[in-house]
């Protein structure tokens, strides 16, 4: 049986998520280019497994601010085949337009001596439930 031991602390996780103030790059619906960045990331003092985030998504020039949570999932982390730390995420975009909605999915952080790898993936659903697309972005 393999046991995962993380060397990343909560403070380091917040810093990692900020990504040196650079945006993450990815795609939505496997075709539209997307940039995602965080304005702030902080540990919830009442729930030490939860990070509160504020940020933005930019899909081909259409920008939307969001707020949300990233929550450490110990069960998924324990079962991770590549020893990644797994978090559940939910980001709610501000606005009520057809192209505003919720990102829900997972963040995996894989430790490396060179550069820690952060990968976000899941599904974006608009508030009217008329559009639903897979997304991913990473550092």
Residue ranges and their predicted role:
Residues 13-139:
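Central antiparallel beta-sheet cores of small beta-barrel/beta-sandwich binding domains
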Residues 1-15:
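Bacterial Sec-dependent N-terminal signal peptides
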